[in-house]
Curated annotation (Swiss-Prot):
Organism: Salmonella arizonae (strain ATCC BAA-731 / CDC346-86 / RSK2980)
GO MF term set: sodium:proton antiporter activity
A biological process term (GO) from this entry: regulation of pH
Subcellular compartments: Cell inner membrane
Protein name: Na(+)/H(+) antiporter NhaA
Keywords: Antiport, Cell inner membrane, Cell membrane, Ion transport, Membrane, Sodium, Sodium transport, Transmembrane, Transmembrane helix, Transport
Transmembrane segments: 14-34, 59-79, 95-115, 125-145, 154-174, 179-199, 219-239, 254-274, 292-312, 328-348, 356-376
Amino acid sequence: MKHLQRFFSSDASGGIILIIAAALAMLMANMGATSGWYHHFLETPVQLRVGALEINKNMLLWINDALMAVFFLLIGLEVKRELLQGSLASLRQAVFPVIAAIGGMIVPALLYLAFNYSDPVTREGWAIPAATDIAFALGVLALLGSRVPLALKIFLMALAIIDDLGAIIIIALFYTSDLSIVSLGVAAFAIVVLALLNLCGVRRTGVYILVGAILWTAVLKSGVHATLAGVIVGFFIPLKEKHGRSPAKRLEHILHPWVAYLILPLFAFANAGVSLQGVTIDGLTSMLPLGIIAGLLIGKPLGISLFCWLALRFKLAHLPQGTTYQQIMAVGILCGIGFTMSIFIASLAFGNVDPALINWAKLGILIGSLLSAVVGYSWLRARLNAPA
């Protein structure tokens, strides 16, 4: 029992459970005895009805759209705290992850196009390596435990959130043809209500969660990635302490174990089960998967490192406190873990063209993300162990 308590109290435990869940999913998805059960579980329909409102989704989409909104709520709370009271409190520190994210989206997309520009079909997947899977990136970072400077973790979270916002904008502009204006209007109204609650000094977390549920539903119905609602709600929950209590910090403390030990492992289990059936060397060495692998493994760290160097060179930003440029480069490699967001963009880019393209894209995403995780972890571990 003491060993179990020690494990769950360690900073690395969440990352270890995440990796185990992902490995289990890969194993089950590729074994004849379990693949049927695995896919049946993900495709199980779950219906939610409140009056005239009805939401029909399978288990996979409930995990990705609903449970992950809770994860993004926690991320929003943590980033807000650092923006107002922590390592991102100055303008030059706050702008650093923004500049990094821009580089981390532009360069991978250009590198992918260098491989696929001559093919008008695969060219449509240019945004696939521009995405970062914040959950898996943080999971790998967590494996290094308390050795990771808090400012570096916050930098990764802020960078990945901006990256995700960029991916959502790209999806809305280039891959979505049926945005619901009415639902977007309801979402905008809910955001105004959240802002008014904050300005009026309302400190009851439940009120924000209730309005947040309306916002989540509206964003979901609009055709935009619903997890965005979680970040927005997190930004509006009050951080200031009153009588020694902060609603944002209290909610952050409550959510952390649920996210680390239930939501993220479940997310990994639901999304990591990529089938390797039908994989051939010819397909693996085609321009589509090679472009994705190059974009994630080379383009991501190159874009982030280059733009960060330019920001520092021209004194537009500062390094996060207690970090080094080498550590920033390692985070850039970890941002090459595109995984679920990349798979989502691939399904939009090729879903109406050829299912085989989606399979090759998934394989490229899996290889690129896995290599980024291994190289990024090894690089950062070496940088953390190096003498200052």
